Amino acid sequence: MPVSSSPLDDVLPHRKPMVLIDEIVAFDAAAGSLTAAVTATREWSENWTAIEFMAQTAAALAGKVDRLGGYTGPARPGFLLGTRRLDLDLDRFEVGALYLVTATCAFSDAETASFECVVTQARDGAVVAKATLNAYRPQDIRGFMTAQRE
């Protein structure tokens, strides 16, 4: 049973106005891949926002995998640890333009994962950004956060 009526709310721990992806357009559980649509806005048009587009797409993938595994609680938060490589082939995202962001899980264990991510222009498929993201999602988020305060 979903925890809300919005498909993004079911798989992302983010809430408006911090949800930057518009919708999930493709999900392939066997390939460990998810594609999301993003419409660039004035507030989120700098090229470095590509990493957040990618991180939210990877989080949506992790959330979809959780749901397939029978998890019914709220979407679990994780942390972007960094990237080994970030290639940006544009200075700014074109405001109002549609982009497709694909995240594919390259590695995953109980709490860490690595995602190969690509951002393309929807109109012509041109690659405008790509990166390998590393993420950490603790099994016990409350315990982890409590330990950080000690």
Task: Mark where each language-model region is.
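Hydrophobic beta-strand-centered segment that forms part of the acyl-chain substrate-binding groove
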Residues: L61-L100
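Short aromatic-glycine motifs in intrinsically disordered, low-complexity regions
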Residues: V3-R15, P74-A75
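Catalytic strand-loop segment that frames the active site of acyl-thioester-processing enzymes
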Residues: P13-W48
